[in-house]
């Protein structure tokens, strides 16, 4: 058996790889094992499986999303622990880039083999590899792995189901505290009986939880005040006394509501206390630091350690330490929506059920808010790691939003035209361009994205050579610009998507709707959205605030916020007049039949137009420009780029007279179907793979064309508009020929034109159907029912899934991130907040 397959078998025995992972399938390749390991997460989990607590998983980024910085940090944590706790020699270890870039995967296998032979690993009763009888020689298969990895699209999220859930330990403590004596149940329970059980559980667990808070105050906080400084007490106990006060009143009102017939007013108590429970925001954001501080204080002072043991003995006979109990409030606040969900399920009366749903929504919203505080704490740790690794950085990265992506690229700038090797960190509001020096980074340029925009350049994609895939980052005024080059087309696509997402976070759709001026904002206090009344989530840049009236909103709610109270009343009318004026100008230009020029040399604003004659006009080779002002003796002309509809000034030496060429022979293309009706296209594409397309001549009008494409199991039709000798499917971009249009959308997603159509033109219909090796039944993509979106949700980066109210989502995973589920819709896969959907239990499979 090949050595890498022996390694795979060993990793399965160590409970790191699931037995059904695709690396075990017939026809599996070694690159699939490399891809599974290269972010370092499973390697760190491996060490913990062999030696419990060998690595503190809080120091490992469990969702690195292939961030090179975070993956390398995880890998180096694994390597250092192999030395320190497993006794491996330095000579037995691979280098971090041997795995991440798969420069020497044979050395990675060698290290794992050495690890399997250590006494610690063998004590687990797992057979090491290779055994003496088995052959080792499979070095040849490791060559070229780096190129194969470059073509790998996404990591396998199901892998992380094998990683320890850091919440599990706290959950066990909570369940232990809340456990009650079993009550005898009737042999056959009615829905009424089940509802009574739910109500009893809500009351009993609230009583026990309030007692636990009282015990923390009485048996730990007060006795320790004589041993610790006031600042230590505040750091360790945070606002636990505020929690106790709130829950004492909450329990009193809950009991009163439960004492009324049918507990009809219980829902009002939960809705009323949603706002008071916002004190959990502070507690949950600081509890991890509190636990670490407690550990440091106890380790430094033996008298404190002894006092803590004494307090624990008095509080609960030593069953739970203070560190254990500090995790309970976070667990409790995340349980209310689960308790109410069960109560709703067993409530029959329609009005009661509807009222309880309001309470359930309130507690789901609260739970999501708490989960986002935890997620943002992880994000801030990630930002801190970036900050500490970048030299010459004199400002806080947290002011520039959440990290989007990081990695190696090549770059040219206006000042320096030769390609430079660089490492870049992209955040919501900034791009950091650095030079890597070992494990640290030297900041070379800090780009504030507020004044930049992204423009694709697909010229390098045709060659498909390494480092030829490029797009441009251009300053609005044209004084500065960068060309960013990427190793593969897929990497370029990922980076471009994240740039577009970052810029859409800075300038979101509907930012100026209803007279507002919404900007990304970090709210110090927990705040509700003006439109939907739900909480803004997290600890920083939770949403948007209007610069004028201070209204707060989610990104997805900006268009629904009531009109701005601080803005002039003529705003809507002014907008309407401007739009009508632009339409009149467009009509006038068409009537005049202005001369057209063809661009043969690009222009991105350098040199800028002289003086203040007007904005520059971006030009790409092949664009058609309609002249609006042009004199032969002048060097600068004004025109409209018909590809983008932008108007501006450009040097006249970048264009030549446009000559309309002879009609193209389309029959040579595998995608051209000739004259065809919609029904004919649907018949051809019905049994083809998603992404298969054809271009047809419309039967009713031979001068017009349409694209038909199979997407999300349906056939969609897109009209191609023809005017002025140009072809377009949207007003944003025009092409000189049908071939150029098709080639562009073979490389660029149609979602820029149609939001629900996130696909490229992938497979011409005349190409033979390429069937990939089918997965075994055990490995087939399974989903755990469906859910219906109750609200809009706007993704903040490419790992998230945007939703529209009413969307039906296939649920793929509920385990990854607390409060977030992974799902699929319209062929797109990503994470979305669980409280934004209503699950359809009838479709569970």
UniProtKB/Swiss-Prot annotation:
GO terms for cellular component: cell-cell junction; cytoplasm; cytosol; plasma membrane. GO terms for biological process: cell migration; cellular response to xenobiotic stimulus; Fc-epsilon receptor signaling pathway; Fc-gamma receptor signaling pathway involved in phagocytosis; G protein-coupled receptor signaling pathway; immune response-regulating cell surface receptor signaling pathway; integrin-mediated signaling pathway; natural killer cell activation. A zinc finger (Phorbol-ester/DAG-type) spans 515-564. Residues 671-765 form the SH2 domain. The modification Phosphotyrosine is found at residues 826, 844. One of its GO terms (molecular function) is phosphotyrosine residue binding. Pfam families: C1_1, CAMSAP_CH, PH, RhoGEF, SH2, SH3_1. Residues 194-373 form the DH domain. Residues 402-504 form the PH domain. InterPro entries: CAMSAP-like_CH_dom, CH_dom, CH_dom_sf, DBL_dom_sf, DH_dom, GDS_CDC24_CS, PE/DAG-bd, PH-like_dom_sf. Keywords: Guanine-nucleotide releasing factor, Metal-binding, Phosphoprotein, Proto-oncogene, Repeat, SH2 domain, SH3 domain, Zinc, Zinc-finger. Gene3D superfamilies: 3.30.60.20, Calponin-like domain (1.10.418.10), Dbl homology (DH) domain (1.20.900.10), Pleckstrin-homology domain (PH domain)/Phosphotyrosine-binding domain (PTB) (2.30.29.30), SH2 domain (3.30.505.10), SH3 Domains (2.30.30.40). Phosphorylated on tyrosine residues by HCK in response to IFNG and bacterial lipopolysaccharide (LPS). Phosphorylated by FYN. Residues 1-119 form the Calponin-homology (CH) domain. Changing residue 529 to R: Abolishes transforming activity. SUPFAM superfamilies: Calponin-homology domain, CH-domain, DBL homology domain (DH-domain), PH domain-like, SH2 domain, SH3-domain. Residues 592-660, 782-842 form the SH3 domain. Couples tyrosine kinase signals with the activation of the Rho/Rac GTPases, thus leading to cell differentiation and/or proliferation. 'Vav' stands for the sixth letter of the Hebrew alphabet. This is Proto-oncogene vav. It comes from Homo sapiens. The gene is VAV1.
């Amino acid at each position: 058996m090949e050595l890498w397959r022996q390694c795979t078998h060993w990793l399965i025995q160590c409970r790191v790889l699931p037995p059904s992972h695709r690396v075990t399938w017939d026809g599996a390749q070694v690159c699939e094992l490399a891809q599974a390991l290269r972010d370092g997460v499973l390697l760190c989990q491996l060490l913990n499986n062999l030696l419990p607590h060998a690595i503190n998983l809080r120091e490992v980024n469990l969702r690195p999303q292939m961030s090179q910085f975070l993956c390398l940090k995880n890998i180096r944590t694994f390597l250092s622990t192999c030395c320190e706790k497993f006794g491996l020699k330095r000579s037995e270890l691979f280098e971090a880039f041997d795995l991440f870039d798969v420069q020497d995967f044979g050395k990675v296998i060698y290290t794992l083999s050495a690890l399997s032979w250590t006494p610690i690993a063998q004590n687990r009763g797992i057979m090491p590899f290779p055994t003496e009888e088995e052959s080792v020689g499979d070095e040849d298969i490791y060559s070229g792995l780096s190129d194969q990895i470059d073509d790998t699209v996404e990591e396998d999220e199901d892998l992380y189901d094998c990683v320890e859930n850091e919440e599990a330990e706290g959950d066990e403590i909570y369940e232990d505290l809340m456990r009650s004596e079993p009550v005898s149940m009737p042999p056959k329970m009615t829905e009424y009986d089940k509802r009574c059980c739910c109500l009893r559980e809500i009351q009993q667990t609230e009583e026990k939880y309030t007692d636990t808070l009282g015990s923390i105050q009485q048996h730990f906080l007060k006795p320790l005040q004589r041993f610790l400084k006031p600042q230590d007490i505040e750091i360790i106990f945070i606002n636990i006394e505020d929690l106790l006060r709130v829950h004492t009143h909450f329990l009193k009102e809950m009991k009163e509501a439960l004492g009324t017939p049918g507990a009809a007013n219980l829902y009002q108590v939960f809705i009323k206390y949603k706002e008071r429970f916002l004190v959990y925001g502070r507690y949950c954001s600081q509890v991890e630091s509190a636990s670490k501080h407690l550990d440091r204080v106890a380790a430094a002072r033996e008298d404190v350690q002894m006092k803590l043991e004494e307090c624990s003995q008095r509080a609960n006979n030593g069953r739970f330490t203070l560190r254990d109990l500090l995790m309970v409030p976070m667990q409790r606040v995340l349980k209310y929506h689960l308790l109410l969900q069960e109560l709703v399920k067993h409530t029959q009366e329609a009005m009661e059920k509807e009222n309880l749903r309001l309470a359930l929504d309130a507690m789901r919203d609260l739970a999501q808010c708490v989960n986002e505080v935890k997620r943002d704490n992880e994000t801030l740790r990630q930002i801190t790691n970036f900050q500490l690794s970048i030299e010459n950085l004199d400002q806080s990265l947290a002011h520039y939003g959440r990290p989007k992506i990081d990695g190696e690229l090549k770059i040219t700038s206006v000042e320096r035209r030769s390609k430079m090797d660089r490492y870049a960190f992209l955040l919501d509001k900034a791009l950091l361009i650095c030079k890597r020096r070992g494990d640290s980074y030297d900041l070379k340029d800090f780009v504030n994205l507020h004044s930049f925009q992204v423009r694709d350049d697909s010229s390098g994609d045709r060659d498909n050579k390494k480092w030829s895939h490029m797009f441009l980052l251009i300053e609005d005024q044209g004084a500065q610009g960068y060309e960013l080059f990427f190793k593969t087309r897929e990497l370029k696509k990922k980076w471009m998507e994240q740039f577009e997402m970052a810029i859409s976070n800075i300038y979101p759709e509907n930012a100026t709707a209803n007279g507002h001026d919404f900007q990304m904002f970090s709210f110090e206090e927990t705040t509700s959205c003006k439109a939907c009344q739900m909480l803004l989530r997290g600890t920083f840049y939770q949403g948007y605030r209007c610069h004028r009236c201070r209204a707060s909103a989610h990104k997805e709610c900006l268009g629904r916020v009531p009109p701005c109270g601080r803005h002039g009343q003529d705003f809507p009318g002014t907008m309407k007049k401007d739009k009508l004026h632009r339409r009149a100008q467009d009509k006038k230009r068409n009537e005049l039949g202005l001369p057209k020029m063809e661009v043969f040399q690009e222009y991105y604003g350098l040199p800028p137009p002289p003086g203040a004659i007007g904005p520059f006009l971006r030009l790409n080779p092949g664009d058609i420009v309609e002249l609006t002002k042009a004199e032969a003796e002048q060097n600068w002309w004004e025109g409209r780029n018909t590809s983008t509809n932008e108007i501006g000034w450009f040097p006249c030496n970048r264009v030549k007279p446009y000559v309309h060429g002879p009609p193209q022979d389309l029959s040579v293309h595998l995608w051209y179907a000739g004259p065809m009706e919609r029904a004919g296209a649907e018949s051809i594409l019905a049994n083809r793979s998603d992404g298969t397309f054809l271009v047809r001549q419309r039967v009713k009008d031979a001068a017009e064309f349409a694209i038909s494409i199979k997407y999300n199991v349906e056939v969609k039709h897109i009209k191609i508009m023809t005017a002025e000798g140009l072809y377009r499917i949207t007003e944003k971009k025009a092409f000189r020929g049908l071939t150029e249009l098709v080639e562009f959308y073979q490389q660029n997603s149609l979602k820029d034109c149609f939001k629900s159509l996130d696909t490229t033109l992938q497979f011409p219909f005349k190409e033979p159907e390429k069937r990939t090796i089918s997965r075994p039944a055990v490995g087939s993509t399974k989903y755990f029912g469906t859910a219906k979106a109750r609200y809009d949700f706007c993704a903040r980066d490419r790992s998230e899934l945007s939703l529209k109210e009413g969307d039906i989502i296939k649920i793929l995973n509920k385990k990854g991130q607390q409060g977030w589920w992974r799902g699929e819709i319209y062929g797109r896969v990503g994470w979305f907040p669980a409280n934004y959907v209503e699950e359809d239990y009838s479709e569970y499979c």
